[in-house]
Amino acid sequence: MSTPARKRLMRDFKRLQQDPPAGISGAPHDNNITLWNAVIFGPDDTPWDGGTFKLTLQFTEDYPNKPPTVRFVSRMFHPNIYADGSICLDILQNQWSPIYDVAAILTSIQSLLCDPNPNSPANSEAARMYSENKREYNRKVREVVEQSWTAD
């Protein structure tokens, strides 16, 4: 990996340790700074409350000029999360900017949990349910939250 990307990832990690956003944690693998594990805790007073959701972030030597590949490892039910865990979020695609760091990425994903974009669905069933039957959508989200407690 190129030195600028490595330096930036070390800086991102240091910032995340020193000033972690609420409900978010993340760290690189022991021997690989380009592969990170992260956890997002479901925001309080939302259907996601109490959930512990695992993600991976894979960076390339083009970071921070190109976004990482981010995927949920935890099973999710959300309009903007594909079955394979990949996330439909503008800052991870066409709205990416080098000013975003790991903390900003994870915070944006945490915000997306509670504020999905049903007009850009990755999961059409979840998007339809979110728009047409919020009670049933919230029930499915609670199932995912409960599964997050026992998942590896």
Curated annotation (Swiss-Prot):
Q: What does the record give as EC number? A: 2.3.2.23
Q: Write out the transmembrane intervals.
A: none
PANTHER family from the UniProt entry: UBIQUITIN-CONJUGATING ENZYME E2
Query: Which InterPro entries has this protein been placed in?
Result: Ub_conjugating_enzyme, UBQ-conjugat_E2_core, UBQ-conjugating_AS, UBQ-conjugating_enzyme/RWD
What domain of life is recorded for the organism? Eukaryota
**Briefly, what is this protein's role?**
Catalyzes the covalent attachment of ubiquitin to other proteins.
Name the PROSITE patterns for this protein. UBC_1 (PS00183), UBC_2 (PS50127)
Q: Which pathway, metabolic or otherwise, does it act in?
A: Protein modification; protein ubiquitination
Known catalysed reaction(s)? Answer: S-ubiquitinyl-[E1 ubiquitin-activating enzyme]-L-cysteine + [E2 ubiquitin-conjugating enzyme]-L-cysteine = [E1 ubiquitin-activating enzyme]-L-cysteine + S-ubiquitinyl-[E2 ubiquitin-conjugating enzyme]-L-cysteine
Residues annotated as domain UBC core:
4-150
Q: What is this protein called?
A: Ubiquitin-conjugating enzyme E2 2
**Which UniProt keyword terms apply here?**
ATP-binding, Nucleotide-binding, Transferase, Ubl conjugation pathway
A GO BP term here is: protein polyubiquitination
One Pfam family recorded for the sequence: UQ_con
Catalytic center residues: 88
From the UniProt record, which GO molecular function terms apply? Answer: ATP binding; ubiquitin conjugating enzyme activity
**Encoding gene per record:** UBC2
